[in-house]
Amino acid sequence: PFPDQNIKGGEIEVIGYRGMKEYDIAFEGYEVPSAHLLGQKEGQGFRQLMSTFESARIQTAARALGVSQNACDLALKYSQERVQFGKELINFSRISEKIAAMFAETMIARQLTLYAARIKDTGQRCDMEAGMSKLLAARTAWASADSALQVHGGIGFASETPISRILADSRILSIFEGTAEIQAQVIAKRLFESNNR
């Protein structure tokens, strides 16, 4: 239940990322008491919210890295345990190359995310680097989840396997805290600004 009768909405069922709840919410005739005003001064809330995006995008990149690393680890483990045609899957070059690429891409995304976080820690503007890290890490998470499912074969598509959840969880990462398309716009704008100085 919502704290006021003028707040309406309900829970939205989602296909992945079930560790947090999603809600549809509408404010009908609801007025925010001045004590609850975001930004402590009228007209400042949006600016204050926007200032959180650098940190939020770095955090989302870090979450995406966790998803990607989990996919990598599961693919490696399964490929070492699963035997086909008398040998472990890891001994098939197409599988080992796929897994090697997954780990390499995850490491690249991790380094970019750490770089963005280091810039943020110094207090410098890092919207471009934060956007780059989120864009790359989210794409990497999705690619790693997809590749891990491919390594698992048909069993990976079964809903009771961890890799199916990872695939569903990875998809939202390129959407929240600014879609991949928004990240690309932010990056392009900053590149254009820095190139025209």
Residues of each region from the PLM?
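FAD-binding core of flavoproteins
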Residues: P1-D73, K77, K87, T179-R197
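C-terminal helix-coil-helix/basic helical segment that borders enzyme active sites and/or dimer interfaces
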Residues: L76-I90, F103-L136, L149-G154
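Hydrophobic alpha-helical segments of membrane proteins
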Residues: T140-A148
